[in-house]
Amino acid sequence: MNGESGDAITSRRIVLGVQYDGAPWQGWQTQLNGLTVQDKLEFALYKFTQQTITTACAGRTDAGVHALEQVVHFDTTLERDMQSWVRGVNTFLPSSIAVRWASEVAHDPAENFHARFSARSRTYHYMLYNNPVRSPLLEGKAGWVFRALDIAKMQEAAAHLLGQHDFSAFRSVQCQAKSPVKTMHAIKIERRGDLIMFTVHANAFLHHMVRNIVGSLIYVGNGTQAPSWLKEVLAGQERKFAAPTFMPDGLYLAKIDYDPKWQLPQTEIQNFLWS
């Protein structure tokens, strides 16, 4: 079965909210070695249904990147109640991956739901540990910068990225997006003790875009560059002008926004990263 289409009359489209620790896995997208989140989820679906099921996700996360709420859909002719999908699939998943909720979406002749293409916007968190000494307890869960960072300067710099822009300067050379033009809705930067949280909300993101933005904001925060530098980087529209891609450890896919008509049982953006 193909998660990309729902043409069969008897087919049902099921949507899952999936949370995972990305540290043990080589990203979302399936690979020959099978060490990805998609591979493990589809294996669990097979064990539960005894059918081969192909999934489609809202955003393909890289190796080491986590998800508070990845959204996934697939098609099936099987009839199961939603809690059965949650409990049954979780039985066969490793401890670092869990289905948090399941929902069936109604057939819409004008537009079938698609986890990726039906999304209106996305939100990512980046959690950064800012302390002279690294924390073993945050290994794989947060980025680390040992030099003191100025939050106010980073906030000033981030304001230059708001609105619709060509984000080529923050785009990976491997990026396959058709257009580098995206709309940045908000960038929020907060500090609690030694933890700094970047919350980035846009209509869509380019490959490595969040990590490249965070890396560039760190250059501003540690005094390497002035806040106005980020405006120049954006205008330059070339990857060479921005800072190097920052580590994946602290990046979390937090929320995918959809039209309320789909009635997905999504949670609000979770704050447990602060706890």
From Swiss-Prot:
It catalyses: uridine(38/39/40) in tRNA = pseudouridine(38/39/40) in tRNA. It is an enzyme of class 5 (isomerase). It comes from the Bacteria. It holds the Pfam family PseudoU_synth_1. Its EC number is 5.4.99.12. Substrate binds at Y124. One of its GO terms (biological process) is tRNA pseudouridine synthesis. CDD domains: PseudoU_synth_EcTruA. The active site is at D62. Keywords: Isomerase, tRNA processing. GO terms for molecular function: RNA binding; tRNA pseudouridine(38-40) synthase activity. InterPro entries: PsdUridine_synth_cat_dom_sf, PsdUridine_synth_TruA, PsdUridine_synth_TruA_a/b_dom, PsdUridine_synth_TruA_C, TruA/RsuA/RluB/E/F_N. The keyword Isomerase applies. Formation of pseudouridine at positions 38, 39 and 40 in the anticodon stem and loop of transfer RNAs. Belongs to the tRNA pseudouridine synthase TruA family. Homodimer. HAMAP family: TruA. This is tRNA pseudouridine synthase A. It comes from Herminiimonas arsenicoxydans. The lineage of its organism: Bacteria, Pseudomonadati, Pseudomonadota, Betaproteobacteria, Burkholderiales. The gene is truA.
